[in-house]
């Protein structure tokens, strides 16, 4: 399945990324190769093959889920240069507000 440069540009726009024409072309080629490989893997007959979810022998190795007291909010806000309604106020990083 061929991934077109237009599709790459569309996804880049949605992701708020900017690519040169050369990069767009390279991404289209690379993504086409990846999709082709996945399609090839989909053709492999896995009938009768046991499902493998991990190669590790361990299962459900987790620490106990115990509640711990966190740092006091007032202490955290002592180092904050600017706050608003109990939130840390930071400079905007998207010019148009970030609407997709």
UniProtKB/Swiss-Prot annotation:
Entry similarity comment: Belongs to the GatC family.
Pfam families given in the database record: GatC
Assembly and binders: Heterotrimer of A, B and C subunits.
EC number: 6.3.5.-
Domain of life assignment: Bacteria
Class in the EC hierarchy, top level: ligase
Record field: catalytic activity: L-glutamyl-tRNA(Gln) + L-glutamine + ATP + H2O = L-glutaminyl-tRNA(Gln) + L-glutamate + ADP + phosphate + H(+); L-aspartyl-tRNA(Asn) + L-glutamine + ATP + H2O = L-asparaginyl-tRNA(Asn) + L-glutamate + ADP + phosphate + 2 H(+)
Lyase among keywords: no
Record's protein name: Aspartyl/glutamyl-tRNA(Asn/Gln) amidotransferase subunit C
Example GO molecular function: glutaminyl-tRNA synthase (glutamine-hydrolyzing) activity
Entry-linked InterPro entries: Asp/Glu-ADT_sf_sub_c, GatC
Cleavable signal peptide: none
Keywords: ATP-binding, Ligase, Nucleotide-binding, Protein biosynthesis
Organism per entry: Streptococcus uberis (strain ATCC BAA-854 / 0140J)
SUPFAM superfamilies given in the database record: Glu-tRNAGln amidotransferase C subunit
GO terms for biological process, alphabetical: glutaminyl-tRNAGln biosynthesis via transamidation; regulation of translational fidelity; translation
Free-text function comment from the UniProt entry: Allows the formation of correctly charged Asn-tRNA(Asn) or Gln-tRNA(Gln) through the transamidation of misacylated Asp-tRNA(Asn) or Glu-tRNA(Gln) in organisms which lack either or both of asparaginyl-tRNA or glutaminyl-tRNA synthetases. The reaction takes place in the presence of glutamine and ATP through an activated phospho-Asp-tRNA(Asn) or phospho-Glu-tRNA(Gln).
């Amino acid at each position: 399945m061929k991934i077109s440069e237009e599709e790459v540009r569309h996804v880049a726009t949605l992701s708020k990324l900017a690519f040169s024409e050369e990069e767009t072309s390279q991404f289209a080629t690379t993504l086409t190769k990846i999709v082709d490989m996945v399609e090839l893997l989909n053709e492999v007959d896995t009938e009768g093959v046991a499902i493998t979810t991990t190669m590790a022998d361990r299962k459900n190795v987790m620490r106990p889920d115990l509640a711990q007291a966190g740092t006091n909010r007032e202490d955290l806000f002592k180092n904050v240069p600017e706050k608003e309604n109990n939130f840390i106020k930071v400079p905007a990083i998207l010019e148009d507000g970030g609407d997709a």
